């Protein structure tokens, strides 16, 4: 697995297709425009990027910006290496507490999105889906997109796998409170009952 910081605090990964808006979501959530570089060229983020969430001068969690998947301009070898590293991280990282999957509401869930949901489902990691660019839809279209996504996910809610969905717009700040609440629910139990010693060395 790629070199990562010690697994001493809960981590939440932000995943999705290239240019889905992962970096922008992290920037909006943290209220820092340039915290995670938001590129207009898909495939720009090619490494795992870790961002600490600080409370009272202490890190209580990390947000992890994963490289976008499925971008056609990436060389096949690069895509293979990415798949291997991502798979290793998702399968082995002990501090993972949840996955935020960002999906363009105008396109809906695609094949690679379903693959990721199944992938993290093997570890029973909760998935929270952001239907991004919701500001592009009127209210009726937003409701229909939300319902369609919920219905499409029913077959994946097996063995109690937690999958939740919300509307999201970084531009209009749609869904900010809902997202913050969801992430807090994931982090707080993990903070109160940590599975990993604070002094665990970095994984490489």
PLM ranges: what are they?
Residues 51, 132, 179:
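Residue-level signal for inorganic ion chemistry
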Residues 20, 77, 81, 111, ...:
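Charged, alpha-helix-enriched surfaces in structured cytosolic catalytic cores
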Residues 1-73, 188, 193-204:
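Conserved G1/Walker A P-loop phosphate-binding module
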Residues 58, 85-162:
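Conserved C-terminal guanine-recognition region of P-loop GTPase G domains, centered on the G4
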Residues 65, 132, 169:
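Active-site glycine-centered loops adjacent to acidic/histidine catalytic or metal-binding residues
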Residues 1, 136-196:
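Canonical P-loop GTPase G-domain recognition
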Residues 3-6, 44-50, 61, 67-97, ...:
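Switch II of P-loop NTPase G domains
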Residues 33-34, 71-74, 110, 138-139, ...:
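Conserved protein kinase catalytic core
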